[in-house]
Amino acid sequence: MFDIKDGKLKISVRTLVEFICKSGNIDNRFKGVTDKNAMDAGSKAHRRIQKSMGPDYRAEVPFKFTVPGENYDIEIEGRADGIFENDGYVTIDEIKGTYRDIRYITEPVYVHEAQAMCYAYFYSARENVDDMKIRLTYVSLDTADVKYFEEIMSAARLKEWFDGIITELRRWGDYLYTHHNERDKSIEGLKFPFDYRPGQRELAVNVYRAVSRGVNLFIQAPTGVGKTISTVFPAVMSIGKGISDKIFYLTAKTITRTAAQDAFAVLRNEGLDFKTVTITAKDKVCFLESETGPECNPAACPYAKGHNDRVNEAVYDIITHENVIDRVKVEEYAHKHNVCPFEFSLDISYWMDGVICD
């Protein structure tokens, strides 16, 4: 999702608000066009709206805003869809294409509104403007009909709101800053935990070289050679050197998943501070029994209803209390916070050092 490098936490406006301000249900009942088709149609709608606004309308206005901090600065970047004068107010326009019938959109989606509020705050802070107007422009991708929502906001209100967003973001940034420092220190003194078997050192060296160079490495070796630890160890070392950010270990069988978990456990016994999550298939981890598979919607599943209202707290709870997050831990915390265990595990993976995929 984001990382801290060279004393900076860099994040886009969209990622910021979609993370901090997300809410609502999981709902897989509404499936239509492919993501690419929707993106293409949305881009065309954006350009059409922007061109229709006249010569004084500035489209795709870039912003970069930095919030200094003690251990790291937060650098936020993005592009406002449009800026124009409206009834004497500088107005930030946020355009959203939708396949919903816009007649039934009675208020703006908070995440969309939050994007506009970020840009409004950036503008008011830079230009010393007392009051700003934000406009949410919803355009139907089927009919091209348009619906507007407008609101005037004071600079003081925008600042108070934005400060709250940054306070929440820093909670997560501080977690990363502290954990990554502790993890990297633990990697510095890490040694290979066994005496090398024939060919094992060569394997580990070649894995490290492949990771360092960003190339693929294909290995064929018999069972019992020690392939798992010989691949996990150099991958961990690459994280300590800043070459890699995260390890993904893909497994097809339970025994290989267990081998990966055991390899990380061995390194933890040697002093490694390293967080891992095991992702279990949705149909295995779903709390509801269904002959047709998981029904991920608020009408059928209480864990889907309001999932996005609760999942951030659930994630923060588990990542700050657990280093080894397996299926049992995922289910335990999912029950505690009343969230979908599968989607919960995916969100956890953003904050882990290693991800073991079932």
Annotate each language-model stretch with its function.
Residues 1-89, 110, 114:
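Metal-dependent nuclease catalytic cores that hydrolyze phosphodiester bonds in DNA/RNA
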Residues 65-159:
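Mg2+/Mn2+-dependent nuclease catalytic core
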Residues 157-189:
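Polybasic (Lys/Arg-rich)
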Residues 177-220:
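Conserved pre-motif I regulatory segment
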Residues 184, 243-355:
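A substrate-engagement module of RecA-like helicase motors
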Residues 208-209, 228-243, 263-267:
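Walker A/P-loop NTP-binding motif
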Residues 212-234, 246:
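Walker A/P-loop
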